[in-house]
Design a protein with these regions (language model features):
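C-terminal motif of bacterial Sec signal peptides marking the signal peptidase cleavage site
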Residues: 22-23
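Short beta-strand element of the alpha/beta-hydrolase
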Residues: 274-283
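Active-site-adjacent alpha-helix of alpha/beta-hydrolase-fold enzymes
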Residues: 102, 109, 113, 153-181, ...
Length: 363
């Protein structure tokens, strides 16, 4: 127990440094276009993410379950895991600090299991309460979803037990066992896995893309969508850099979003409306500001998109003094509504889906 306390204390010091950091990399300015209006079918949207992106994928799924039919959680845990018991009593940054402490110690390292963190049963009850209050979509819409979960055997950042807790959380909500796939036998580090790009399989380092001879993009898309056409040899569509600011509106400065996001548009989706949308959330230190287009172009999503009429949205978060690693908000740095459909990041990404659904402006 003493060693656990020592680790927790070290993590708290790390958190204090994170929250008081004064500098971050300057965002580069680049030419951007408007998000193309493609007449997309957003009622069969799927989401995926790694690390903080995994938590955001789960949060977006819960908030907009009527639109989302599947979620892929890579090196992430259950929805609401980081929320402190003091969330309703300590205002502002104090709650975010407590949430972040819980996030690292209880939702990544799994050091708080003896204190009931992360309890899938309790988290499912809290999710049901949020749904009853109308803060997220009805749980009944989640129970029809297809779920993919992944933990690499060489991942020392997020404990395998945390990912298993996520699988248990979905089961507690009522998602059938047949709809849940947990992959835990690949020696990957803390990274997105491919069969032809990235670092050596066991590495956990930028750009957090590794080659394990496993096509994770294809695996998770098949789990969520079912049978797909074989992927293309090379991607032939367009990676469009678009301005994210209109989707955050007046909350842009506090949303944590980067100015520029990316959407991959297959040629078939420019020519004919009705393409489905997959939203891929990057992990911490995996945004374009940090690793360029490595995750976007090396993950393999585009090759599957080309042959299956699938638009892939890559929204982006920026590094900042309160979020120096450019993580998605899964502990409340954007405010207390971070788990609800009113969360700045969730609301902005949902507006991006609305923009893709619009017609008459295909570019």
């Amino acid at each position: 127990m003493t060693s656990l306390i020592r680790i927790a204390a070290r993590n708290l010091l790390f958190l204090a440094v994170m929250l008081t950091a004064t500098g971050c990399r300057e965002a580069s300015h680049e030419a951007t276009a408007a998000l193309p209006a493609l007449g997309a079918n957003i009622n069969e949207t799927t989401v995926s993410g790694i690390s903080s992106g995994a938590y955001m994928a789960g949060q977006f799924q819960m908030a907009h379950a009527k639109r989302v039919i599947g979620a892929a959680i890579i090196a992430g845990g259950p929805y609401g895991c980081s929320e402190s018991v003091f969330a309703d009593t300590i205002p502002g940054a104090g709650t975010a600090f407590l949430n972040l402490s819980k996030a690292v110690n209880g939702c990544m390292l799994d050091l708080l299991e003896s204190w009931g963190v992360a309890d899938p049963t309790e988290l499912a009850k809290k999710a049901e309460a949020r749904a009853a209050k109308g803060e997220i979509d009805p749980i009944a819409d989640v129970t029809r979803d297809r779920i993919y979960l992944f933990t690499g055997t060489s991942d020392r950042t997020v404990a395998p037990s945390i990912v298993r807790h996520a699988a248990e959380f979905y089961a507690k909500l009522g998602v059938p066992a047949a709809n849940i796939e947990l992959v835990s036998n690949i020696p990957a580090g803390h990274a997105f896995v491919t069969d032809d790009n990235g670092n050596a399989c066991e590495i956990s380092a930028e750009p957090y893309v590794v080659d394990c001879n496993y096509d994770q993009a294809g695996a998770l898309l098949k789990q969520m969508y079912g049978t797909l056409q074989p992927r293309a040899e090379t991607a032939t569509g367009d990676f469009v850099n678009f301005d994210q600011r209109p989707f955050a509106g007046s909350e842009m400065s506090s949303s944590g979003l980067a100015e520029t996001g990316v959407v991959y548009v297959p040629k078939a989706c420019r020519e004919t409306p009705g393409c489905r949308v997959h939203v891929a959330f990057h992990g911490c230190a995996q945004n374009r500001e940090t690793v360029g287009d490595a995750f976007i172009k090396e993950s393999g999503f585009a090759r599957w998109a080309d042959t299956n009429r699938l638009i892939v949205l890559f929204p982006q978060v920026a590094a900042s003094p309160i979020n120096p690693q450019g993580c998605w908000d899964w502990w409340g740095y954007t405010g207390p509504e971070y788990l609800t459909r009113n969360a700045p990041q969730i609301a902005a990404v949902n507006r991006m889906l609305d923009g893709l659904q619009a017609s008459g402006g295909r570019a």
